[in-house]
Amino acid sequence: MSDINATRLPGAYPPVPMPCVGDADNFTLTRGENLC
């Protein structure tokens, strides 16, 4: 699905407000989200 592409857009897919959109882009990597 194009969900991964949607995450690249700022505040497009991330369910929670994250200052690091880059980390949110890789939602599959929970480690990256934790770093944010």
UniProtKB/Swiss-Prot annotation:
Chain residues in the propeptide: 1-10, 20-36
KW Transmembrane (keyword) present: no
Gene Ontology molecular functions: toxin activity
Sequence position, cross-link Cyclopeptide (Gly-Pro): G11-P19
UniProt keyword list: Toxin
Post-translation changes: Processed by the macrocyclase-peptidase enzyme POPB to yield a toxic cyclic nonapeptide. POPB first removes 10 residues from the N-terminus. Conformational trapping of the remaining peptide forces the enzyme to release this intermediate rather than proceed to macrocyclization. The enzyme rebinds the remaining peptide in a different conformation and catalyzes macrocyclization of the N-terminal 9 residues.
Similarity field: Belongs to the MSDIN fungal toxin family.
Function: Probable toxin that belongs to the MSDIN-like toxin family responsible for a large number of food poisoning cases and deaths.
Official protein name in the record: MSDIN-like toxin proprotein 10
